[in-house]
Each structure stands twice: as structure tokens, then as C-alpha cells.
Amino acid sequence: MLSAAALLPALLLGLLWPGAVRGRPPPGRLPPGPRQRRWDAALFARSVARLPAERRDAARDGDYLLGYKRLRRLYCNVGIGFHIQVLPDGRIDGIHSENRYSLLEISPVERGVVSIFGVRSGLFVAMNSKGKLYGSTHVNDECKFKEILLPNNYNAYESRIYPGMYIALSKNGRTKKGNKVSPTMTVTHFLPRI
């Protein structure tokens, strides 16, 4: 429900917007057709939805958890090229060809932070304090990664709880310890593929 502080700007916007009030069009303009009226109504609705009071309410409700979940395969172009796979026994490694264990669900946890879920294995990608990747049955702080867009349009995934540790694959497809790599190394560069 809109608060009084949010209603005043909405009311003023509705009164001052020329397309919001039905009447004569301004001089030199044709009367708006049905398409133009729908467009004006859509723009008005969008502007009302972005009022500060509502934005605070939405952020409090934790609507980022309802964000856009992406089904992707994370491809690392190192060695012969590998996709990250999450196996049912909790191991995480790279495989050259796509398979059912390499399909991942990348979900936003908060702004710029994601969790990575192995769809077939039912495990989350997690990194421990030593930089080793493992599969976790439940989401915890070790399952949260900062998704960083690099200048070459690849992504790097940095541990949220252990800054400076990145998800990485070796040229043989094995995982590398997160504390032994940096985002300038190609072993940390991943391309999300559909």
C-alpha cells in the first residue's frame, strides 16, 4: 500500500503529465489514439512503481531472492576448454563436452552476488577457507560468489566470504585452489553459455 509520502508525487505526476488527463490535446498535437493512451498509462504505472517509499518496502521484503534465475553452463577457455560440473558425490571439476552435471542454475542472492546450483546433482558450489571447491546440500555463506564482469566479457566468481579467492579450473580440468589464482589469470575466466 502506498504511503502518504508516496501518494503526493504520484498525484502531482498524474496532474502535470499531459497524457494522463483526458481533455483537449496541446496545440499542434493530434488527439492520442488507443495505442498512445496505453503507452502513456504504461509509462505512468512504471513511474509510480519506482517511487522511493515503494522501493524501500520492496528491498525490505527481500525481493532479490525472487530474481531472475539463469540456466547456464560455465565455460572456461583454458587447455582444451572445460565446463564446470557438479557431481552428486560433491566433487567439482571441469569436463570438455557438455553433460547433465554441467547444467547450472545461477541465482542472484543480492546485488552482484550469486549462488551456483548444480541442477542434476542438487548441490550448490561452495568454497572453503582454504580455497577448495565442494558441493553443499544447503546454501550458506560459502556458497555466495561475487559475479564480476571482466573487460573481455567473461565472468570471474570471487568468494563473498573469502575475498581474493576465485573459482578456477586448471588446464587439465581440475579445480584450482582459490587462493592461488587472480582475476587476471585466464583460469578464472568463465563464459556463461546457454
Curated annotation (Swiss-Prot):
Signal peptide (from-to): 1-23
Family: Belongs to the heparin-binding growth factors family.
Role played: Plays an important role in the regulation of embryonic development, cell proliferation, and cell differentiation. Required for normal limb development during embryogenesis.
Localization of this protein: Secreted
Protein name in UniProt: Fibroblast growth factor 4
Keyword Signal: yes
Gene encoding the protein: FGF4
Pfam families, per the entry: FGF
GO MF: fibroblast growth factor receptor binding; growth factor activity
CDD domains given in the database record: beta-trefoil_FGF4
GO cellular component terms attached to this protein's record: cytoplasm; extracellular space
UniProt keyword terms in alphabetical order: Developmental protein, Differentiation, Growth factor, Mitogen, Secreted, Signal
GO biological process terms held by the UniProt record: fibroblast growth factor receptor signaling pathway; neurogenesis; positive regulation of cell division; positive regulation of cell population proliferation; positive regulation of MAPK cascade; regulation of cell migration
Tissue expression: Posterior ridge.
Tree of life domain: Eukaryota
